[in-house]
Structure formats: C-alpha cells, structure tokens
C-alpha cells in the first residue's frame, strides 16, 4: 500500500474496515495478491489475515494488534467460512466493492488528491492539538471533516 491509502486507513476509515476489505482494496487498486494467507486472533476473535511482499499483514494496515493462530484445526468452522468469503471476493471483486459503501467511498477518496491533502492537514492539526493537551478531538472529527469534503 502506498502513503495515500495508509493515510485514509489511519484517519477516515479507522476501525471501519476488516482484513478482507483491505485484501479487496489492495487487489483492486494495486493489482497485488498476498504472499501468504494466515489466521490471526484479536480478543478471542479469529479472522483471516494476509501477508504481503513487504511482510506486512493486512491487520497491520488497520492498526490491529494481533497474534497468529498456530492451530487452525481448533477453529475449523471459522477457517472454512473465511476461505469461502475470500473465494467469493476473488470470483467477483468488483461486485464485492460495489456492494460496500465503505469500499466505494475509499476508492473515490483515494482517487481525489484534494481529499488526501485535507486528511493530511487535519491529521497534522490533530497532532498539534494533542501535543497542546486537547484530546477531545478524535478520529470522528476527521471522518466528519473529510466526509464534508467528499460531498463537494
């Protein structure tokens, strides 16, 4: 992933997407497939995760702290469902993206340079406010501000 997509994932789409969504976005925008498919665990929630060329997991792009599941036999049902969902994405990538408002919005904002610049400015302002001790302004502010920009 490039800087623009990471900026969007870290600001506007923070905690909104999952690893399958990141998989679909990378496959659609960058035409890249993962090197390896693994299963990760976060707070007793097991999900599919993807390792890319730079040894970064899809969950890392989302800022998730996860651990690798070593024994997939103990969670066979989850493994089967996750593989089935991934094959559905592979069979109809554009359909998967079109049915998701979040993914359509991500791609729309990714293609707008103005939205990326404003996200960068808002993020730097948020950092300055945090350094000044004002913690009340969070990611919701950024999401709302960029949402207004994307409507123009």
Swiss-Prot record:
Keyword Transmembrane helix part of the UniProt annotation: yes
GO annotation, cellular component aspect: membrane
Pfam families named in the record: Pox_H7
The protein, known as: Late protein H7 homolog
Keyword Chloroplast: no
Compartments (UniProt record): Membrane
Family to which this protein belongs: Belongs to the chordopoxvirinae H7 family.
Induction behaviour: Expressed in the late phase of the viral replicative cycle.
